[in-house]
């Protein structure tokens, strides 16, 4: 696998972990043409922009219809439109958050001790992201 990201700090962090990652803009034709799209098994985009994800799914499916393409959408309409473009799965974070909480409740975590482990894990993750300068995961393009 290969991670493509527009944030140089993310690339540096991934490379330190020996995760193959390159800096780039997925809408850059030269970058896309340099990737072995005909050989990939799966592509995952966490970018919330509809047009970018539409470009990703259309480009990959044109070259490799069997590749699994997982994308992210902000709205129900965007998710449904990405499915029309042949996305295999579309993440909708707002709804996933609700599902996650429902699962926590169904696991009978009805007292403060049931949430202690989740809370500690979450606080650790938040501090790690804050230490990296991430207040919110949005990355603006120049």
Question: What are the residue ranges of the model-derived segments?
Answer:
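Cytosolic regulatory regions of ion transport systems
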Residues: 1-142
């Amino acid at each position: 696998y290969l991670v493509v990201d527009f944030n140089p700090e993310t690339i540096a962090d991934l490379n330190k972990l020996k995760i193959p990652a390159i800096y780039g803009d997925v809408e850059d034709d030269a970058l896309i043409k340099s990737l072995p799209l005909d050989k990939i098994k799966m592509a995952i985009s966490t970018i919330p922009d509809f047009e970018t994800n539409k470009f990703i799914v259309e480009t990959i499916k044109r070259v490799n219809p069997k590749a699994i393409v997982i994308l992210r959408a902000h709205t129900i309409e965007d998710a449904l439109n990405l499915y029309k473009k042949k996305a295999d799965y579309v993440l909708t974070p707002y709804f996933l958050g609700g599902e996650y909480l429902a699962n926590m409740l169904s696991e009978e975590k009805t007292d403060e001790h049931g949430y202690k482990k989740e809370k500690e894990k979450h606080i650790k993750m938040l501090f790690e992201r804050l230490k990296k300068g991430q207040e919110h995961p949005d990355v603006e393009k120049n």
